[in-house]
Amino acid sequence: MFSPANEAHFALHIDAVEHDFSVLEFTGVERLNQPYAIELTLVSERADIDSASLLHLPAWLEISPGGGLHGFITRFTQGESGRRLTRYQLRLSPQLGYLEYRTNQRIFQHQSVEQIISCVLRENAIHSDAWRFSLSADLGERRYCTQYDETDLHFIQRLCEEEGLHFHFEHSRQGHVLVFGDDQTSFPQLESIGFSQGSGMVADQPVVKRFSLTAATRPDRVSRRDYNFETPHLLLEAGARLESAPAQPALEDYDYPGGFSDRGRGRQLSQIQLERHRSHQLEARGEGDRPDLRSGHFLPLTGHLRDDWNDLWLLTEVHHHGKQPQALEESISSDTSAVDGFVQGYRNRFVATPWQAIWRPPLEHPKPRIAGSQSAVVTGPAGEEIHCDQHGRVKVQFHWDREAQADEHTSCWLRVASGWAGDRYGAIAIPRVGMEVLVSFLEGDPDQPLITGCLYHVEHVPPIELPAHKTRSSFKTLSSPGGEGYNELRIEDRKGAEQVYIHAQRDWDQRIEHDQRLHVGNERHEHTAANHYSEHLAELHRTVHGDRLTELKSSDHLSIAGNQHCRIGQSLLADVGREIHLASGRKIVIEAGMELTIKAGGSFIKLDPSGVTISGPTVRINSGGKPGQGTGASPRLPGDTAPADRSQAGSLLVPAQRQALMLGKPLCAICEEPGSDA
């Protein structure tokens, strides 16, 4: 005769089908932040049950009147058959358990963890009445959150662990509800249960028969550090510690990167981590036979010899075990005996923590790490060829992202690595929409991608023909928008044909603040299609060791503010087609060492050592006539030169900031605000 505490009336209810299953035995484990699994051994008079037809059906395991566990049949096995009964095994799991079989790779942007988890649950056909959030505070928005090569279940568990969220299940015959919480208020409370030291006597009511408490060493302080490129000199460090540190050496949990971009978030994450350590410092373990114990519920314990243990305990883990041998009416090659004497009824084992310790889930589901690099395609708004922000960051679409639409919303802004980067100096080339780029991940974190280079492929070919011109190096751009034009710097290293080639599609501006020196070893050729303007603010010196050959297709205008001096070693020969007009404000002196001849119209005047010879048909001296008139000089002035484009020098770090950065000391947050001159 069994006492009421040990009487068993286990039953399995599957409302969708008719069956004659009797429960022979069941075991199961419930844990906070874990899907439960209940394994049942059943017997039936039918030996022809279709196993596949029962998969995914909801079922209710009744353990006590009105109490039990609800789940879906996720595995069904037919076993041995006797003369009349056949044995079956099945597993009950929550809807959440199905998420273990769905793996995804995708990106969530500008959503809170609550919104992300809700989205995943809805996608898995878990209706909104089957889960709820019981939060004491709003969860902040995550600008960028990647699910990378992890199951939906792993993803949800990881997010809960990162945010310090817990979840448990509430059961009824109609279904089970998944409950998320961030503090102790979301845990329901069971009726109190008495403690009865195991003595071999059978209790009249369910009791806790064994109860032990273990205290373990845990860190008493947490420190986190991170880096934010938008405030590079601000030391992002935060921490949390016990208000009254125990009399022991300081046990610090320090980690980098801490996963935050501002100190407020850092303090929050540090506090969650400290609570995680402390929630597992004291851990109670017990055994009993009360069938309504559930993980995620408070258990009020009474009757223990240690009065301070008679308190609320949070059940974090419950192991269920039930046997009902009376379901067997004949032997099916089974032995219902047990070494520990448990052959019939219900019993459990449980793990609990003090109610005062805020329970945080252990970090058992790490964020996936991406080893190495990946390729992606730069994206942007429709019709835009270059899409970037003030930091030169661009957006990409990864090849594994099935949900992105190749627009400006595909990813977060990705920083672009450069061979050199300073304060307004260095090198920069913005990857353009459609380019394939190489993406790496800081610390292997899928949420921190950055671009390290660009890649050619069969449609985007190099700007030089390869391998025919494998000795060439080139930096070639494309005019935007519309293309067609380009700028290029090309270097040819083929022996005997070395060349540096520069092409400017429109303007080429040079600004040299001091000297320019140019040496051409052979010939220099220069072609200007329009006007050529040159302005020298000081002297112009030019030496030609050979001939100077100059041809003017039109006029030559020369305006000299001072004197012009011309020295010719041998002859000055000028052939003028129409007129030479020399005019002077005061005098003109023409001097020749041996001979001076003026010749016109068959007449001439000749001056030489022998005298002055005047020859002409008629020679008139003071006999009328008039002088000829010249055209007169009217030289045009040159046009003004246009200034070259101008840039500005970069800046060094402020000495105080540089010193603090090197020493790892905190900086003034105000000085780090964008636009600060400090």
List where the protein language model places each region.
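Amphipathic alpha-helical and helix-coil boundary elements used as assembly
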Residues: 1-678
